[in-house]
Amino acid sequence: MQVLRRVITCAALLALAGCDPARVARLEEGVSTETQVRQQFGEPVTVTVLPDGAKVLDYPRQPEGWTNYRITIGPDGKMSSLRQLLHADNFARVHPGLATEQVRELLGRPAKMQPWPLKNETEWQWRFRPDVNRSQLFSVFFGPDSRVLRTAVSDDPAEQAQAGR
């Protein structure tokens, strides 16, 4: 029974991962409307209205997925950008001293937030794929002032468990 449950879970995750590229391909910057974006991606987890009337829609795929999408709808109601936030360039922008809000702006909602009381730190983790065959974790450690202390990249333990490592 547990094997069947694992197979069904894996199939569902693969199906979800396979849907996003098709959704992205159906949308075009400067052409697609907010309604079309919501038809493809559903309701966003967060909506931020900017001073000029533009909207920023966040679609995190964490904790089970490997992407976080941020879609901007311009004041004209058309999609002006669609970005996947979890990539090396954004990870490189995270440096000591950044505040939690700045990190969330760069990477979107984390997969996991883990307090480490004895160290007086909090760790945020994001799952990502550096290539199609690997899953890794990008971790950001915050001090008691909610500022970045350091970052780290490690292998995804969930992937290792599935592989029987």
What do the predicted segments below correspond to?
Residues 1-17:
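Sec-dependent bacterial lipoprotein signal peptides
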Residues 19-165:
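Residues within mature, well-folded domains
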